[in-house]
């Protein structure tokens, strides 16, 4: 009788979800306990005995197998939105849309940066030389020029007067022994001895020994004072010759020549082609003018101004166009080209392979067949 209230109490204290399992367990226990109190036997053999006393609770049985899964519950509330996933790959390019209408013209842009300056145009042809201007006032006397170079050696002068007698020189060194001298004189006759018996004639006596050589005389040196006087006389003559030659050169060069250092520029005032001018200067023992400095170029400018004619110079670019050289083939060490020159713009006259100098000292390339003033360099 106590089993029923006990079972109810256990059921009330268990959670609802384990109610089915407990009922099954309880049912199994009740049957076991009933069999323990009353000897059970098959119904065929007779009635069961009366109930005995309640036995003690047996040991806990093993855990039964899990039950069948329950029915699926209702869907829960939707969770919160998760974070934004990574960007997907670009889709394929769609077909181009239809061309839109032309929009209105935009405002004009700011002006661009000015472009670089263009190349300088070719220089115009050289104009003709204008008429000579009126002579200017006489200039001031220039500074004294440099002493000219030593002139050529003159012819031998007349023999000068004999110099003064020099002083006696110091004694000379002792000379080497001289050769054997001549035989010495015979000795003095001795006193006559007593007359002896006349013997046979004796043999000829030997040659006597050479006598001693006399001392060598002293030799005098040339007079130093006289030599110095001769040198001073020659120096004075050279200075007088240089001065006379310098004056002669100035007279000879004026007005158609100029001297610069060791060079002399000379003109006859006539005009020739370049080739003819070369021949004229070569036959005269010189060459065409080749200015190698500003000073030499200025001297040529003075000659050209005096003649009022442009003159040919010796340089050409016949071998290599644009590369002017001296007659020796050397490149130029000095040049004074006019602006835009050389330009080889010969026009109908042909290539400009020669050089001319104007009265202002500027150079211009010119056709070699033209006529220009001839200036030779010596």
Curated annotation (Swiss-Prot):
Its main location: secreted. The modification S-nitrosocysteine is found at residues 35, 40. The modification 5-hydroxylysine is found at residues 87, 99. Residues 43-221 are annotated as: Disordered. Residues 137-146, 173-197 have a biased composition (Low complexity). Residues 260-378 form the C-type lectin domain. Keywords: Calcium, Coiled coil, Collagen, Disulfide bond, Extracellular matrix, Gaseous exchange, Glycoprotein, Hydroxylation, Immunity, Innate immunity, Lectin, Repeat, S-nitrosylation, Secreted, Signal, Surface film. Transmembrane segments: none annotated. Residues 1-20 form the signal peptide. It is found in: Secreted, Extracellular space, Extracellular matrix; Secreted, Extracellular space, Surface film. Residues 46-222 form the Collagen-like domain. Hydroxylation on proline residues within the sequence motif, GXPG, is most likely to be 4-hydroxy as this fits the requirement for 4-hydroxylation in vertebrates. GO terms for cellular component: collagen trimer; extracellular space; multivesicular body. Pulmonary surfactant consists of 90% lipid and 10% protein. There are 4 surfactant-associated proteins: 2 collagenous, carbohydrate-binding glycoproteins (SP-A and SP-D) and 2 small hydrophobic proteins (SP-B and SP-C). This is Pulmonary surfactant-associated protein D. It comes from Sus scrofa.
């Amino acid at each position: 009788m106590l089993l029923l209230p006990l079972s109810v109490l256990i059921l009330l204290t268990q959670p609802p979800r384990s109610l089915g399992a407990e009922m099954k367990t309880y049912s199994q226990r009740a049957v076991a306990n009933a069999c323990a109190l009353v000897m059970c036997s098959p119904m065929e053999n007779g009635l069961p005995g009366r109930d005995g006393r309640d036995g003690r609770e047996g040991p806990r049985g093993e855990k039964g197998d899990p039950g069948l899964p329950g029915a699926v519950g209702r869907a829960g509330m939707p969770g919160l939105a998760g974070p934004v996933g990574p960007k997907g790959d670009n889709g394929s390019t769609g077909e181009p849309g239809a061309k839109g209408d032309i929009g209105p013209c935009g405002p004009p842009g700011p002006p661009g940066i000015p472009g670089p300056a263009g190349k300088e145009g070719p220089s115009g042809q050289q104009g003709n030389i204008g008429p000579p201007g009126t002579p200017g006032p006489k200039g001031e006397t220039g500074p004294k020029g440099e002493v000219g170079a030593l002139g050529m050696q003159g012819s031998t002068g007349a023999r000068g007067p004999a110099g003064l007698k020099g002083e006696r020189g110091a004694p000379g060194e002792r000379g080497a022994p001289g050769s054997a001298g001549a035989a010495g004189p015979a000795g003095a006759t001795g006193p006559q001895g007593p007359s002896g018996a006349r013997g046979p004639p004796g043999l000829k006596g030997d040659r006597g020994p050479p006598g001693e050589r006399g001392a060598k005389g002293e030799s005098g040196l040339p007079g130093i004072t006289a030599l110095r006087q001769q040198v001073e006389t020659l120096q004075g003559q050279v200075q007088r010759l240089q001065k006379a030659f310098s004056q002669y050169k100035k007279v000879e060069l004026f007005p158609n020549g100029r001297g610069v250092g060791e060079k002399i520029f000379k003109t006859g005032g006539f005009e020739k082609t370049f080739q003819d001018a070369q021949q004229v200067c070569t036959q005269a023992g010189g060459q065409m003018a080749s200015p190698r400095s500003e000073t030499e170029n200025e001297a040529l400018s003075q000659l050209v101004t005096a003649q009022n004619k442009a003159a040919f110079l010796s340089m050409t670019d016949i071998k290599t166009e644009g590369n002017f050289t001296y007659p020796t083939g050397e490149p130029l060490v000095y040049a004074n080209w006019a602006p835009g020159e050389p330009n080889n713009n010969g026009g109908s006259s042909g290539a400009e392979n020669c050089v001319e100098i104007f009265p202002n000292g500027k150079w211009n390339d010119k056709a070699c067949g033209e006529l220009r003033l001839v200036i030779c360099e010596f």
